[in-house]
Each structure stands twice: as C-alpha cells, then as structure tokens.
C-alpha cells in the first residue's frame, strides 16, 4: 500500500500501481471525467501513469490552465489524425498549443484551402466520438526513427534526429501515432468543443529556405458554451480589426516596399501625437528627463551589451567605411552612453531618463500583423540609474505611473505578473531574493494583487508585467518593469559611493505603453475606432444645411480651432444627411449642424456620434463642454 497526500493536506491509502484516474474515480465519477492529467510530486504526468510510491498528488482538470492546455494539445493530435485519414499521403510535422487554441503544420500533396476545413472538422468529430483510449510507449531513439521512417514521416525523423534524448515517447489513439512529450487526455471522447478557424502558410522550422507547409489553426474549449463565447469574441474582434478601421479612418497603411513598417497618415499622426504628448507629460511629472540617441551604432557596442550574441538574427546590420554597424533593436545600450558621459556621485542618483526611441527588429514576414507586430516601432523606454537602497522606491513610483497611464487610456481591468528567476541566470541567490522581494514590496505598496511565474524572468533580473484586458475580454501584454544586473556591469555604468569607492549602478528598465504602434492598434480595437474625445483625430465636424451657411460654418470652425479643438470644416455641396452619415462612419465624436436659425441666433446645434441630439448652445459653451471632457480624459 502507498500513501497519497492531497493539496488540502489529507492523506489516503491506495494499492501500489494505482493511477491518477483511479484516484479521481474513488473521489467522484464527475471528477474522473474532468481529470486531464496530474502533478505527482510536482511533475506533470499522464492520468494513467502508475503511482508506485508515497507521493503528493494534485489532479488537473479542464478548469485548470494546464488542463485546458492539455485538451488543446490533444485536439492538435486529433486534427493530425483526421488529416491523415482524409489525406493519407500527407506528412505531419508539429502541432503546438498557442493562445486560445492550437495549430498543426502539414506537408500536403494535394491543394488545400479554407473550404476544406469543414470536412476536416467533421472527420475530427467522428474520430472523437469513437472514444479511443490515448496511450503512449517509450522507445529507444533508433526504434522511433525506424517507426516514423516506415510511415514516410520524414519530418518526424528529422525532429527525432535533432533531440539529444535517447528515449522517445510515442502517443497512440486508434490507428494514429505521433511523437510527443505529453501529457495527453486519457480518451478522445472529452474533445467535444472545438473549431478549425483558419489556414495559413508557414516555412518548416521558420526558415524561408525550407518547404512552405500548410498551417491549420483551431480552438478548443472545455465546454460548448465556452467555445461559443470565444467564437462570438472572434467575430467581434474581426469587426474591431485595427487594420480595417485604420483604412476607414485614414490612419495608416502598409505596402510591400517597406514590409512591417507603417506609413502614417495625417489622422494617424494626430492620434500618435496625443499618445506621445501624454506620455511626455507623465514622464515629466515623474521626474524623467528626455533624451534622444542614435539609431545606428558600431557593432562593438552590441557585442559589449550582449545583444550581438542573443539577438543577432533579429538585428539589421550595415557597413560603412570598413566598419560594421547595427540598427538598434533596443534603446538601453545607447541610453547608458548618455549616463556614462558624466561622473556620478551617489548624491546625484536616482537619474531617470526617458526616450521615445525607434528600434528595428528583423521579424519573420509571416509573423507581421498590422501595427501589432512590426519591424520598426517607437518604444516609450525609461531607464533609471540608482543605488541598491533606492530601487524599491523607484519601482513603487513606476508601478504608480503605469496604473495612472492605463486608467487614463481607458484600461481599468488588468493583471500583474512577476516573472521570477530562470534556471540559467547571472547573480547569486541572495541578490535574486532581494530583487524579487523588492518587486513584491512595490506592488504591495500600491495595493496591487499579482501572480508569480517562476522561471520566466530574464537571465539578468526579474520583472513585472502588466497585462491589460480590453473591451471584449482579450488580454494584451503591455508594460514591463525590469531589474538588470548585467548591462550596467557590461557597459560600465557606475557611481561614486559615500566612501569614495566606484560602484556599479543598479539599472531599471521600464516601458509603459511599450511600442506606440502596437498601443495605438490596441486602442483602436479596444474602442472599435470610437476613440475618446481627447484622442480622436478629428473631434468636431462642422457642416451647414446649405451653402448659405458657409460663412457661418467658417466662423464657427475658426472659433473651435482657436480654442484648441481639432475640427474639420465640411462645405461640400451635399445633402446634410449624407454628410452626417459620412462623419458618423468616420467616428467623429461631435457634429455641429448649422442652418438658417443657428446662423441668425449665433448658436450651434450639436449631435453626438451615437446619434444623440444635444440641442443648441453657444460656441463658447460648447468649447467649455469639450474642454471639460478632454481634461477628464472622457
């Protein structure tokens, strides 16, 4: 007999060889039905793995994040199974879990399009209903190679060859087998709520020199209700797509001459200026001086900073006068050069620098996505140089600033995470203990709840991440606050302490909105293009019922502009209904409509974008009304 301890501290006795599924059944049939896998002494295992000794056990169900991930990974296998049934000559490659779903890459011999997805999905449902048990076997590497070679699965053979392990795990359901580390669901019958969503091209191993594969995306959920809710969200997200809205509102465009880099139009630049000016004012409030540093620097700087060894593939390089240069992928090393121009005393610290720094990263073309994933973007970087004693207070201020910014932009629902030390890191445990505690203390001081994520910090320090939730429930990873033990040492950022000794400065990195391009894309989708008044590129459209009001329209327009309102004058010889519809589609917050009565009484009639009639008032009262909203960030 063996003793199994549960998360609540209780201990129960079982026969040796029992598995997690049996344990779940002994508690309740419904728990067994929901069990996907289990943690056995902190190791994630298949639900049918035998337990032969005393242990701690935590059952993983579909309600747990790990359970949902296992469900989705198993659904990717079901997709591959269905494809092999329908297209036997297809070679399967890899099928990982991604946000809210999964994908699988295939090498089809036939031409496959979006129209084929319903057929594949139907086959998946047929296979799931078979309730096939899912099992695995562990075999020597050579045997796994022979097994997949015999099936003509050359990509699997290549994958196995690239793995250092001498033992391979092969999962089987019905007549389909796949290479996988697992764990997987106990039975295919639990796969009931899934949908194939789209098809795309993807190079094998992300290398454009390799074969172009067909990538099929899908989503999978614990219940049909969850699936329906997600599909509704996707439908709403499609309506809010910033690329479509950006075209309608004439904000920006992309073209193949400059892939992954936006061409900003006048309306887009107006939004950009509001975001940048707001952040500049916020930085001033929190004591940051603004700097501007070169986009290009000698490659030796990137070698010293460590970027050359870690980001070389994502860096754009150039040559001039027999010297190697790189376009910066990050702003930190050039910021340190500004700090290093002076000798600093501990009395000078903290020194806070902010920069709207343009960076370039050679992202794969297949990953580019409007403003959300680009090759050139402007980062609202901040770098703080301070003493160890000042770190906690600086982080407290940065957290406070982040919260102010997000709330002003209309994001009131967010999650905060602390990424803790990874296995491969620099610095001793004592330093990491102190650093991680500082981040926790700073969040506690701001009354912020947070989650801990062990192993997800950078090798040079822990960090805080801010994840914003938008109007339709999507989560966006946005700001970061990062402690850095490495770069100040590498680049010689020092100060003189009170004993006259030279010390390495502590460096804090922070980005609040992050990439301005991405943040503006987020804002467009969050508000579905209906930006709040203070951000709207055009705040008021002025129009007359007939051309008889042209002079009065011009007079009102000039008064609005003099009061700092971004107004548009529409004197076209069109029907008033046409003008109203057009400016409504352009998401202009307020429409000023002028007729004979307004002209004679020197008043204006105001209509909101929503269609609500605000009645009549003087131009001065309207300007005061608008200014109140703008100041309140409404």
UniProtKB/Swiss-Prot annotation:
Q: Where is this region: Catalytic?
A: 241-532
Domain TGS, chain residue ranges per copy:
1-61
Per UniProt, the keywords (alphabetical) are: Aminoacyl-tRNA synthetase, ATP-binding, Cytoplasm, Ligase, Metal-binding, Nucleotide-binding, Protein biosynthesis, RNA-binding, tRNA-binding, Zinc
Recorded hits in Pfam families, A to Z, give: HGTP_anticodon (PF03129), TGS (PF02824), tRNA-synt_2b (PF00587), tRNA_SAD (PF07973)
Q: Which Gene3D superfamilies match?
A: 3.10.20.30, 3.30.54.20, Anticodon-binding domain, Bira Bifunctional Protein, Domain 2, Threonyl-trna Synthetase, Chain A, domain 2
Q: Which family does it belong to?
A: Belongs to the class-II aminoacyl-tRNA synthetase family.
What is this protein's name?
A: Threonine--tRNA ligase
Biological source species: Francisella tularensis subsp. holarctica (strain LVS)
Q: Which taxonomic lineage is given here?
A: Bacteria, Pseudomonadati, Pseudomonadota, Gammaproteobacteria, Thiotrichales
| Gene transcribed to yield this protein | thrS
């Amino acid at each position: 007999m063996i003793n199994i301890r549960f998360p609540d501290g209780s201990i129960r006795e079982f026969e040796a060889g029992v598995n997690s599924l049996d344990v779940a059944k002994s508690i309740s049939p419904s728990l067994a039905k929901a069990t996907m896998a289990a943690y056995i002494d902190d190791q994630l295992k298949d639900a049918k793995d035998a337990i032969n000794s005393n242990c701690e056990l935590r059952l993983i169900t579909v309600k747990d994040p790990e359970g949902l991930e296992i469900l989705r990974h198993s659904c990717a296998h079901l997709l591959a199974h269905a494809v092999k049934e329908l297209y036997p000559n297809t070679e399967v490659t890899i099928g990982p879990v991604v946000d809210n779903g999964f994908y699988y890459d295939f090498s089809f011999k036939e031409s496959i399009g979006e129209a084929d997805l319903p057929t594949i999905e139907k086959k998946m449902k047929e296979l799931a209903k078979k309730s096939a048990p899912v099992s695995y076997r562990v075999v020597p590497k050579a045997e796994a190679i022979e097994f997949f070679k015999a099936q003509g699965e050359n990509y699997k053979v290549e994958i196995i060859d690239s793995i250092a392990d001498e033992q391979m795990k092969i999962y089987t359901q019905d007549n389909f087998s796949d290479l996988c580390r697992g764990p997987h669901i106990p039975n295919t019958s639990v796969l009931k709520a899934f949908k194939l969503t789209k098809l795309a091209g993807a190079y094998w191993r992300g290398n454009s020199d390799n074969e172009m594969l067909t990538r099929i995306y899908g989503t999978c959920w614990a219940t049909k209700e969850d699936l329906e809710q997600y599909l509704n969200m996707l439908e709403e997200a499609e309506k809010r797509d910033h690329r479509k809205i950006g075209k309608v509102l004439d904000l920006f465009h992309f073209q193949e001459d400059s892939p992954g880099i936006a061409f900003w139009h006048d309306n887009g630049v107006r939004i950009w200026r509001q975001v940048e000016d707001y952040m500049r004012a916020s930085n001033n409030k929190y004591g940051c001086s603004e700097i501007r540093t070169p986009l290009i620097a000698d490659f030796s700087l990137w070698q010293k900073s460590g970027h050359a060894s870690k980001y070389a593939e994502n860096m754009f390089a150039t040559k001039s006068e027999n010297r190697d240069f790189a376009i910066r992928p990050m702003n930190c090393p050039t910021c340190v050069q500004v700090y290093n121009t002076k000798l600093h005393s501990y009395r000078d610290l903290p020194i806070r620098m902010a920069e709207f720094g343009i960076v370039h990263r050679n992202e794969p073309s297949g990953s580019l996505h409007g403003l959300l994933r680009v090759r050139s973007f402007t980062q609202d970087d901040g770098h703080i140089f301070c003493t160890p004693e000042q770190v906690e207070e600086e982080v407290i201020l940065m957290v406070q600033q982040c919260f102010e910014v997000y709330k002003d932009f209309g994001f009131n629902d967010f999650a905060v995470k602390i990424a803790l030390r990874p296995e491969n890191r620099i610095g001793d445990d004592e330093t990491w203990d102190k650093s991680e505690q500082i981040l926790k203390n700073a969040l506690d001081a701001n009354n912020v709840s947070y989650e801990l994520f062990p192993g997800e910090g950078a090798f040079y320090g822990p960090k805080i991440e801010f994840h914003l939730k938008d109007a339709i429930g999507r989560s966006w990873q946005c700001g970061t606050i990062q402690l850095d033990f490495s770069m100040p040492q590498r680049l010689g950022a020092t100060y003189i302490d009170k004993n006259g000794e030279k010390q390495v400065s502590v460096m804090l990195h922070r980005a609040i909105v992050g990439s301005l391009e991405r943040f503006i894309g987020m804002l467009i989708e969050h508000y579905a293009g209906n930006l709040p008044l203070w951000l709207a590129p055009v705040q008021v459209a002025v129009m007359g019922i007939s051309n008889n009001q042209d002079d009065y329209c011009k007079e009102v327009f000039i008064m609005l502009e003099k009061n700092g309102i971004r107004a548009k004058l529409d004197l076209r010889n069109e029907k008033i209904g046409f003008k109203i519809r057009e400016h409504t589609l352009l998401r202009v917050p307020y429409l000023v409509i002028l007729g004979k009565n307004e002209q004679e009484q020197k008043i204006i009639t105001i209509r909101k974008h929503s269609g609500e009639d605000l009645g009549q008032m003087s131009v001065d009262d309207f300007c005061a009304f608008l200014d109140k909203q703008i100041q309140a960030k409404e």
